[in-house]
Amino acid sequence: MSQMRCRHLLIKYSGSRNPVSRRTGGSTASVSDESAKAELQQYFDAINAEGCTEEVFAKYATKRSDCGSFKDGGDLGVFGPGDMQAAFEEGCRNTAVNSMSGIVLSDSGYHLIFRTM
């Protein structure tokens, strides 16, 4: 299980290592930890309510993710051990293929992860 592939929906907040949204170009420095988690929980609930498929997840990642991968439905491509931040990689590894994680915190912010490989 060395190679993985995931989509993600990232919400940055004031504590993110680079608090700037790649989707909007705006600062996220005024977004609190609590509001970022609460917003991500709403997306988690909406994705599950709509049917947690890769297509549904990609739609929401395109709509809201603060990562530049929003343009590709949150797709990060194939990666191996050590290619991503440890917390994110662990979140991906602990998520079954074709399913979504719970909320994962990394230095970049809060993520939902949909593992595709």
Give, region by region, the residue ranges found by the protein language model.
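Short, cationic low-complexity segments
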Residues: 29-40
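Proteostasis/folding factors centered on peptidyl-prolyl cis-trans isomerases
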Residues: 1-30, 84-117
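Peptidyl-prolyl cis-trans isomerase
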Residues: 38, 42-86
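Short amphipathic alpha-helical segments, especially helix-boundary/capping motifs
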Residues: 16-18, 34-35, 65-66
